[in-house]
């Protein structure tokens, strides 16, 4: 059965390109895994797939199994140990702060990704397809990928409302249900709704209004709006400066009668993380290259081999997305 093992499907939509939709998708996926959920990310931005680059796995390739295509693993689930359970019980007897630490220390879920970027021979190859071929590719992604047991499947979509969105909506409404009563073994996956991503500017929020109308016309519930790039946080003093404006997404959500999930200022640390740089790297690229050359010659190059999810916990934006993840879990699972 297509989408077998998937419990909930969330679409990530945006009206315009460049609002950070793919980075929001990834951060929400990482935050959900840190809540103990197994997560899949399906990238259907066929002409501009970003997920392989963001997770640092551009060289990965899709493998085939008897059940279908196997998604690329970003990190595996962390098993709960007996000693971990004992520690949790011991700490829970001490009260307040310790209980919060135990809650944060819950075993993380797995994260897997599927993208056309993994199927291209070269990452620079252009995808020049007409609508019917895009539609066929999206249907194949939805029917031929074996996700296994997955709590949440996040679908990273292209900006706007294009052929991809129409094909996705039509196929998902056949393969899933929007009813919250769909539970149990053999039940259809639940299309829980869409998260809309915008920046504060009016030119972006005006296009997100079209996404809200798209959801209404296709009977896809709207879970909420995230206002991305809502200011810049100085890494030295922590002061937030509004580079563009602020509050546009919140005003739009209120006017459209949609839940406003929150604002996310620009996180320089997350940008460095997905670009493969450390926070301490110099802004002077020439000096940086020279230093790396010397370190390589000395064999002293430091490579942080921790999983992406563990390094992400050090980004201050993790706190924002942890809140979004908890809100969505509470809304969806009750």
UniProtKB/Swiss-Prot annotation:
Residues 289-302 have a biased composition (Basic and acidic residues). Binds 4 [4Fe-4S] clusters per heterotetramer. Contains two stable clusters in the N-termini of nbp35 and two labile, bridging clusters between subunits of the nbp35-cfd1 heterotetramer. Keywords: 4Fe-4S, ATP-binding, Cytoplasm, Iron, Iron-sulfur, Metal-binding, Nucleotide-binding. Residues 274-302 are annotated as: Disordered. CDD domains: Mrp_NBP35 (cd02037). One of its GO terms (cellular component) is cytosol. GO terms for biological process: iron-sulfur cluster assembly; tRNA wobble uridine modification. [4Fe-4S] cluster binds at residues 234, 237. The keyword Metal-binding applies. Heterotetramer of 2 nbp35 and 2 cfd1 chains. Component of the cytosolic iron-sulfur (Fe/S) protein assembly (CIA) machinery. Required for maturation of extramitochondrial Fe-S proteins. The nbp35-cfd1 heterotetramer forms a Fe-S scaffold complex, mediating the de novo assembly of an Fe-S cluster and its transfer to target apoproteins. This is Cytosolic Fe-S cluster assembly factor cfd1. It comes from Emericella nidulans (strain FGSC A4 / ATCC 38163 / CBS 112.46 / NRRL 194 / M139). The gene is cfd1.
């Amino acid at each position: 059965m297509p989408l077998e093992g998937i419990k909930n499907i969330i679409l990530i939509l945006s009206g315009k390109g460049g609002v950070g939709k793919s980075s929001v998708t990834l951060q929400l996926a990482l935050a959900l895994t840190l809540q103990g959920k197994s997560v899949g990310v399906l990238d259907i931005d066929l002409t501009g797939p970003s997920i392989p680059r963001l997770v640092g796995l551009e060289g990965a390739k899709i493998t085939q199994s008897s059940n279908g295509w196997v998604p690329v693993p970003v990190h595996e689930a962390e098993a709960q140990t007996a000693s971990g359970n004992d520690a949790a019980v011991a700490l829970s007897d001490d009260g307040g702060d310790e209980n919060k630490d135990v809650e944060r220390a819950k075993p993380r879920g797995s994260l897997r990704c599927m993208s056309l970027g993994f199927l291209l021979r070269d990452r620079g190859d252009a995808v020049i397809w007409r609508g019917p071929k895009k539609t066929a590719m999206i249907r194949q992604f939805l029917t031929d990928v074996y996700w296994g047991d997955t709590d949440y499947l996040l679908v990273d979509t292209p900006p706007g409302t294009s052929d991809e969105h129409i094909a996705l909506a039509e196929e998902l409404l056949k393969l899933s249900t929007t009813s919250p009563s769909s539970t149990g073994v053999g039940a259809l996956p639940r299309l829980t709704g869409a998260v809309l991503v915008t920046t504060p500017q009016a030119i972006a929020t005006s296009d997100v209004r079209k996404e809200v109308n798209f959801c209404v016309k296709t009977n896809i519930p709207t879970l909420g709006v995230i206002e991305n790039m809502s200011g810049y946080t100085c890494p030295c003093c922590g002061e937030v400066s509004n580079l563009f404006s602020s509050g546009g997404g919140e005003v739009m959500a209120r006017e459209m009668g949609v839940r406003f999930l929150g604002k996310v200022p620009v996180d320089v640390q997350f940008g460095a993380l997905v670009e493969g740089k450390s926070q301490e790297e110099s802004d002077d690229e020439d000096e940086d290259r020279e230093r790396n050359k010397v370190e390589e010659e000395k064999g002293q190059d430091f490579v942080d081999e921790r999983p992406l999810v563990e390094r992400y916990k050090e980004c201050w934006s993790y706190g924002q997305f942890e809140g979004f993840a908890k809100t969505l879990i509470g809304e969806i699972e009750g």
